[in-house]
Amino acid sequence: MDWNHYRFRSPWHLPVPPAAVFAVLERPEDYPHWWPQVRSVTWLDDATGILTIRSALPYAMTFTAHERRRDPAAGILEIAMSGDIEGWARWTVTAAGSGTLAVYEQEVDVRKPLLRRLAVPGRAVFRANHRLMMRAGRRGLLRRLRAV
C-alpha cells in the first residue's frame, strides 16, 4: 500500500437545480468566499491557477490546478493538480429528483515532505481532516446557492 496515495469521493445532495450548482462550482476564484478551507486562488492564465487550502490541522497545502475538462452539458469539471498534492479532482453535477447530486472525486499523491513523513501514523487523521473540509464546503455551497 502506498500510504501517500489517497482516493476520495464525496456526494453532495443539494436542493437546487444542477445549472445553479455548476455555475458556482465552475468559478474557483470565488471558492474562498464560501468554502472556508480554500484560502486563496490565484489565476496564472485562463485554465491554470494556484490554490492554497487548509482544514482543521495546522498545515496548508498549495498546488497548481490546470483545467482538463469543463463540460456544462455533461456537468463535469476536472482539473490536474501538481505541487503539495499531485493527481486529479473532478466535480460531476447531475439532476437528482428535484435537486442536484454533485459528486467530488479526487485521486492524489501527497508530495508535501512533512505529510509524507507522517503518512503511516497520520493517515486516519488526514482522511478525517479531508472529511471536515468537504462537510464545510457543502455547508458553504448551500449558503452561497441560497444567496444567489
Would you name each region that the model predicts?
Residues 32-36, 42-88, 101, 135-148:
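Glycine-rich portal/gate segments that line the openings of hydrophobic small-molecule binding cavities
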Residues 1-46:
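Hydrophobic ligand-binding cavity/cleft-lining segments
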Residues 16-18, 71-72, 96-98:
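Short loop segments at secondary-structure junctions
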Residues 17-23, 129, 133, 137:
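Short amphipathic alpha-helical segments
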Residues 81-135:
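Beta-strand/loop substructures that line and gate deep hydrophobic ligand-binding cavities in soluble
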Residues 24, 125, 144:
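Residues that form generic nucleotide/phosphate-binding pockets
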Residues 3, 57-58, 115:
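Short, aromatic- and cysteine-enriched interfacial helices/patches
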Residues 11-15, 42, 66, 92, ...:
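Generic structural detector for well-ordered beta-strands
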